[in-house]
Structures are given as structure tokens and as C-alpha cells.
């Protein structure tokens, strides 16, 4: 029996349950084990809690032998590799885009200036401000139902959350607008899961690898390489989206390319620096590093140092 560690929220157990069911369908008995993390116990702003707030307890459970593997939202994993663990599988990604849930079925452009929009993410807050719509950004914590209720109760005019989370909980009917990357670049690895186990557990790693999706792994690798190079940690205002696309060469042969778009935004929305590049899935990390280098050339370091030292970066 493969014991799979998961956070206790409905979203987390739904995500991990999908991994469990996929393993069972392939003939590998599996069960979920709920682990409480520091991020679940705290009601403070996510970025004040530190990197790894949702993952450390799950990793400890693996190391102590209480579980065999753990399912993380990939974007919650620290960008620095931990040699004790291996990401044995990155399953096929859900929709990586951000989504708006607004009162009266409105889209962002229809909300009047001064409308209250909730988000838990400095990245979303910065890009929302950069749209120049005059929206008032408010911090947002709690599970997805709690967040949605803040709109239905009239406490907020809208919230911006990951579309993937809404999809996994069957709440896509609440979405009033899906934000295209040209409006808002998602968080690196948004919509993707990471299935992690002990680095030396080659037998389990081989079983988990049956769930791996090569295109998703390439995309996530490029996005997280960009994030790591920017030394941003998971709460900095960095967006990135990569995808594997088919192209045709001069001889009419189809081949795969990996495209990557990245941005760094000032928290006040006054500036957004964007860069993009194209590479191959087999050199995903190199693509991430090259787009990060272009962002640095365009002034990302100066923009991010301002974000790091801003005492008011609570949302």
C-alpha cells in the first residue's frame, strides 16, 4: 500500500485523491494520509510565512516514514532542490491561468474604479494594478469556499484565484472571466502537481513515474528555472508560462518547441517587465535561464529589489 501524504484542505485532498486513483487504476494500491502544515495553521499573509510553508511538514512525514510519497501544488515547492527528495511524477497539468469570480457576472473591465478585489498573491496584485483599472486590492486567505463566499456575501466585488483549483473542486461555474496570459501571467508551475518521494526509493519512484507527463514536466522545469534564477521565492511578483507547441520545419517535418513567457512586476503596478523565448523540451532549464537573463537585462533586478524592501508588500 502506497501511503500518500496530503494537506487536509478539500482542494489538497481532491488533488491527492486524483493521484491515488490513478495509481490504483494502474494496479498499485494507495491511500491518503492527511498532514497538517504550518500554512494551514496560520491565518497570516502567505508571503509572511516563508518559503515551504505548505511543504515542509509533508517532507518531514516522508523522511520520518509516516508516508511514502506526498502530493504538492507544484508552485508551493521551494525552487531550491532538496537532495533528500525526488519529484518522481509531474502529472498532466490543469489549466494554468488565473480566473476572476466577480459579483453580478462581471469581468474585470466592467468593475467600477474603487471596486474591492481580493487576492492572496503579490504577483496577481501587481499585475492587477498594472491593468490601470483603479481597483482596490485586498488580502485574501482561507480555503476556496471561504474566498468565494467573500464575493457572494458582498464583502468583496471580485476575487482572482487559480482556475485549476476551481476546476478540481467543480466550481468553474462561478468563473466570470478567465485571464489570458497577456493580461496576467500565472505563477510558475500554477495548475501543476508534484508527486515527491525519498530520493533513494527507486522502486517507488519508478511506480510514481507512470503518472509523469513529459510536456508538463518540460514546461514546469522552464518556469521554475526562471523563478529560481530570479531568486524570487514563491511570493515575489514573478509570472511565467511555458508550453510545448508543434512546429513544422522547412522540409515539412513536425517537431516540438518549448515557448516561455515571463514577467516581473512592481508591486504598485507602475512597471511590468516582460520577456519571452523559444527552445526545446529537452533543454527546458536552459530556456528558463535565458529568459531570466533577458529580464535582468531589462531591469528586473532593480524592480525586484524594490519589491523586497517594500514594507507594505502584504498583498
Swiss-Prot record:
Pathway info: Porphyrin-containing compound metabolism; protoporphyrin-IX biosynthesis; coproporphyrinogen-III from 5-aminolevulinate: step 2/4
EC number: 2.5.1.61
List of residues that carry S-(dipyrrolylmethanemethyl)cysteine: 234
Alphabetized UniProt keyword annotations: Porphyrin biosynthesis, Transferase
Organism from which the protein derives: Mycobacterium avium (strain 104)
Catalytic reaction list: 4 porphobilinogen + H2O = hydroxymethylbilane + 4 NH4(+)
Family: Belongs to the HMBS family.
Cofactor: dipyrromethane
Manner of cofactor binding, per the entry note: Binds 1 dipyrromethane group covalently.
Protein name (database record): Porphobilinogen deaminase
GO BP annotations listed: protoporphyrinogen IX biosynthetic process
Note: The porphobilinogen subunits are added to the dipyrromethane group.
GO cellular component, one term: cytoplasm
